[in-house]
Amino acid sequence: MASREDELRNCVVCGDQATGYHFNALTCEGCKGFFRRTVSKSIGPTCPFAGSCEVSKTQRRHCPACRLQKCLDAGMRKDMILSAEALALRRAKQAQRRAQQTPVQLSKEQEELIRTLLGAHTRHMGTMFEQFVQFRPPAHLFIHHQPLPTLAPVLPLVTHFADINTFMVLQVIKFTKDLPVFRSLPIEDQISLLKGAAVEICHIVLNTTFCLQTQNFLCGPLRYTIEDGARVGFQVEFLELLFHFHGTLRKLQLQEPEYVLLAAMALFSPDRPGVTQRDEIDQLQEEMALTLQSYIKGQQRRPRDRFLYAKLLGLLAELRSINEAYGYQIQHIQGLSAMMPLLQEICS
């Protein structure tokens, strides 16, 4: 004998096991499909026995008219049935949601690319910012205002700035030379790509030190503020643009593979002046971009981050404008370009 609980789980039309509420009534899959198909027809079924047929799990197919009437009596509503177009649209959206929720698997080639980039980054830029303290910084740059003991005299801020920027560019050059795909390019193209991207890569990697709370760069025991940039001689308008860029990028909470892939996209830009192998470099940039897309999709991020890749493309374009403005600033700060011949060559 069926219990009351079992009855509550049974289809209210035929008594089979219910799968849920369909069109406003607790029914099985069979009665759900029957109701959708039947009410969509222009002519309804008729009963040859004056509407007195039994509708049960074993008898439900014998009389469509009585089955339909029992569906209606149980509360199933015609107005809740979607049109074919609406149903197709809903299924497409459901499939899209499932695809978004399913982590994207990186190919073996993409995994190897990320390993190569991370390895080069670790070897040449992993501890780069902690080494700034070696370049005799002024006392006010120390977070706790306690400079490390040094035998060498402390240099002016502008000299310290020139030294750390030259050091960063040298490390970026070592990073790129550690990438087999970069070394495979003609030397002329290597130079053109480096001249175009070195400053951009510096800022992409430097972003990992940017503190959103204080709006400063924290590099080991040192802290660099927007006021320090102004003391060196940079225009306030440029510095505000630069710090806004770093704040926007830092808020995206990128992971290390995303930073290095973003740097690689900046490096392999086929539209840099002087590039000859544009098609090959364009293909390399596309490889970096697709790997970054796949990595982002595979991270199961929060819904608000679903436009992360598009945001990064926008920031790359913004960074290029900053790069051009930076070159102009370097050339017009008195005495600075003479202290940074390598950077002057890159920005020329």
Curated annotation (Swiss-Prot):
PROSITE patterns: NR_LBD, NUCLEAR_REC_DBD_1, NUCLEAR_REC_DBD_2. InterPro entries: NHR-like_dom_sf, Nucl_hrmn_rcpt_lig-bd, Nuclear_hormone_rcpt_NR1, Nuclear_hrmn_rcpt, ThyrH_rcpt, Znf_hrmn_rcpt, Znf_NHR/GATA. Phosphorylated at Thr-38 by PKC, dephosphorylation of Thr-38 is required for nuclear translocation and activation. One of its GO terms (biological process) is regulation of transcription by RNA polymerase II. A zinc finger (NR C4-type) spans 11-31, 47-71. Composed by a short N-terminal domain followed by the DNA binding, hinge, and ligand binding/dimerization domains. This is Nuclear receptor subfamily 1 group I member 3. The gene is NR1I3.
